[in-house]
Amino acid sequence: MALVPYEESAAIGLQKFHKPLATFSFANHTIQIRQDWRQLGVAAVVWDAAVVLSMYLEMGAVELRGCSAVELGAGTGLVGIVAALLGAQVTITDRKVALEFLKSNVEANLPPHIQPKAVVKELTWGQNLESFSPGEFDLILGADVIYLEDTFTDLLQTLGHLCSNNSVILLACRIRYERDSNFLTMLERQFTVSKVHYDPEKDVHIYKAQKRNQREDL
């Protein structure tokens, strides 16, 4: 998630983000996520898309045991934490400035025997991708990463690098603006995309994407 500190006047209706702790129950664990809206803005609060994607993972929609997963723009790390609790080997990523905060949440919410399953690592989309092996991950996770149009090209480049032909991408988002739909159109040029879940209460969609078979494009 991008780091955008917000003025108090812009946060009307967002009181839940100002709470220092957000508590959830996933995978038979109580998870307490520390939030810090004033210092780190959107990167340091739990958005509904992260909650819905975590619920979707808990439903067993994808096999996580033995799975190599990466969370992009992790922010507070909720999705990556849940994936690790459910058996995945997870690399939880965000920009350098957010890593200390992210790591503190991951370490606070994973039991010692599960902590080796979660690695916090720096990743700025489109930069230094060589630090990750091409097609390294079985599953790529992103919650509310589609909102800054200037990042779309870098995000697509990053997805393309991290995916193999068999990798699955799960993106959870709320379609707020036309630009959000525009990203999905851009995604469809490189990936086969389908909507696999919708939470009407939180108005969050989950999209599944996989690299297009070259034969499909002939």
UniProtKB/Swiss-Prot annotation:
Subcellular localization(s) per the UniProt record: Cytoplasm
EC number from the UniProt entry: 2.1.1.-
EC class of the enzyme, as a word: transferase
SUPFAM superfamilies xrefs: S-adenosyl-L-methionine-dependent methyltransferases (SSF53335)
UniProt keyword terms in alphabetical order: Cytoplasm, Methyltransferase, S-adenosyl-L-methionine, Transferase
Superkingdom, taxonomy of origin: Eukaryota
Residues that, per the record, bind S-adenosyl-L-methionine: 47, 73-75, 94, 125, 143
The keyword S-adenosyl-L-methionine is assigned to this record: yes
Gene Ontology terms describing biological process: protein methylation
Quaternary structure note: Interacts with heat shock 70 family members; at least some of these proteins are methylation substrates.
PANTHER family in the cross-refs: HEPATOCELLULAR CARCINOMA-ASSOCIATED ANTIGEN (PTHR14614), PROTEIN N-LYSINE METHYLTRANSFERASE METTL21A (PTHR14614:SF14)
Protein name (database record): Protein N-lysine methyltransferase METTL21A
GO molecular function: ATPase binding; Hsp70 protein binding; protein-lysine N-methyltransferase activity
Lineage: Eukaryota, Metazoa, Chordata, Craniata, Vertebrata
Cellular component GO terms, alphabetical: cytoplasm; protein-containing complex
